[in-house]
């Protein structure tokens, strides 16, 4: 019996896979629990159309991320913060401060996609990575200076 999986099933396949299973397993478990549907010609056609639309949508999201990456490519930030006499920052500089500085420059970036490798606790030059898409990321250099 051929079926189309509606969700990931362990040891069988992933969502939208067309797999062959024994009739009893498909009829008595997978289909009643909503994990699969029978792979009729019309269901296969609908699956192909859905996958085509999803691929088109994902391509558009990736192009948008690449456009934002192109805008961020030459950006360099300077973050002024309060510093002790030994050169240590009061607190630390993280993704929130970087997102605020980018917003001042006109780039609205969610702070959750900005990654700073280590805690920035001293004055100096550092790099942050903005992960716009799983395949698109931009490295932004920033410098922490005393106020």
UniProtKB/Swiss-Prot annotation:
GO cellular component assignments: ribonucleoprotein complex; ribosome
The uppermost taxa in this organism's lineage are: Bacteria, Pseudomonadati, Bacteroidota, Bacteroidia, Bacteroidales
Question: What is the native source organism of this protein?
Answer: Bacteroides fragilis (strain YCH46)
Could you list this entry's UniProt keywords, alphabetically sorted: Ribonucleoprotein, Ribosomal protein, RNA-binding, rRNA-binding
Give one GO molecular function term.
structural constituent of ribosome
Cross-referenced HAMAP family: Ribosomal_bL9
Question: Which GO BP terms apply?
Answer: translation
Under InterPro entries, the record lists:
Ribosomal_bL9 (IPR000244), Ribosomal_bL9/RNase_H1_N (IPR009027), Ribosomal_bL9_bac/chp (IPR020594), Ribosomal_bL9_C (IPR020069), Ribosomal_bL9_C_sf (IPR036791), Ribosomal_bL9_N (IPR020070), Ribosomal_bL9_N_sf (IPR036935)
Pfam families according to UniProt = Ribosomal_L9_C, Ribosomal_L9_N
Entry coiled-coil feature ranges: none
Tell me the function of this protein: Binds to the 23S rRNA.
Identification of the protein by name: Large ribosomal subunit protein bL9
Q: Which family is this sequence assigned to?
A: Belongs to the bacterial ribosomal protein bL9 family.
Bilayer-spanning residue ranges: none
């Amino acid at each position: 019996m051929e079926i189309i999986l509606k969700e990931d099933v362990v040891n069988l396949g992933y969502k939208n896979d067309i797999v062959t299973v024994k009739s009893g397993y498909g009829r008595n478990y997978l289909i009643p629990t909503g994990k699969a549907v029978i792979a009729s010609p019309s269901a296969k056609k609908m699956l192909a159309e859905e996958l085509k639309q999803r691929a088109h949508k994902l391509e558009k999201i990736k192009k948008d991320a690449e456009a934002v990456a192109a805008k961020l490519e030459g950006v360099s930030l300077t973050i002024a913060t309060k510093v002790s006499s030994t050169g240590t920052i009061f607190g630390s500089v993280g993704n929130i401060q970087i997102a605020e500085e980018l917003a001042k420059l006109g780039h609205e970036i969610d702070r959750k996609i900005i990654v700073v490798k280590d805690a920035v606790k001293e004055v100096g030059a550092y790099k942050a990575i903005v992960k716009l898409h799983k395949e698109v990321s931009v490295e932004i250099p920033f410098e922490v200076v005393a106020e």
